[in-house]
Amino acid sequence: MRFDIITLFPEFFASPLSSGLMAKALARGIAEVVLTNPRHFSTDKHQRVDDEPYGGGVGMVMKPEPLFAAVESLPALPRREVIYVTPQGQPLTQQHLWHWSRERDQLVILCGHYEGVDERVVEHLVTQEISIGDFVLTCGEIPALVILNGVLRLLPGTVGKAASLHQDSFEDGLLDYPHYTRPAEFRGWTVPPVLLSGHHGEIAAWRRAQQIERTRQRRPDLYARWLARTQGQAKTH
């Protein structure tokens, strides 16, 4: 799979791409990451990529010409998505990550800066707007890295035990269950006895109950959706 990151700061990605599972995945040829700086496509002698907004207002807006030129300079694979990371986008979910990992050959991720990009970029170049939360960051590189990491770990061969991917939080609409390891007792705090019992059925039931209760307490929005879906499935049987 190919990832194209359109960024004013390619150096931002140096450390993440050279460490951990992402570095191993790239070394194995599971994916390719190409960083493209839109400044290189500016026709301004000072390589400016931003200008003042029409209608007035604070801040600067990224110009359309360098962004269009940067994206159009890339090879276009048959199943390509052009993503703009912005607080105005759809909230990123695990379902987005799975969809891209299975249904796309190329992700082009546009990192915004300043007050954002010229709306013509969004209307005529971008195919999907994505937000990682209801907050504002200084740059689009951080959410771009979130998407890159989230999709990359789902590609076959990146994670050693592929089965573990389906036990993560959000895979079935619930949060993950608690995890414990040795020692069985630490500073007087003990591991739940059921996990030491060796009864796989009881362990599975305990973990499921923990998932449901944890989701109900911490993410009532997720719990409500899970409950509605579960009840709907029960009515169809």
Swiss-Prot record:
It comes from Thermosynechococcus vestitus (strain NIES-2133 / IAM M-273 / BP-1). It catalyses: guanosine(37) in tRNA + S-adenosyl-L-methionine = N(1)-methylguanosine(37) in tRNA + S-adenosyl-L-homocysteine + H(+). Specifically methylates guanosine-37 in various tRNAs. Its EC number is 2.1.1.228. GO terms for cellular component: cytosol. This is tRNA (guanine-N(1)-)-methyltransferase. Its main location: cytoplasm. Pfam families: tRNA_m1G_MT (PF01746). NCBIfam families: PRK00026.1, trmD. Homodimer. It is found in: Cytoplasm. One of its GO terms (molecular function) is tRNA (guanine(37)-N1)-methyltransferase activity. It is an enzyme of class 2 (transferase). The keyword Thylakoid does not apply. S-adenosyl-L-methionine binds at residues 112, 132-137. One of its GO terms (biological process) is tRNA N1-guanine methylation.
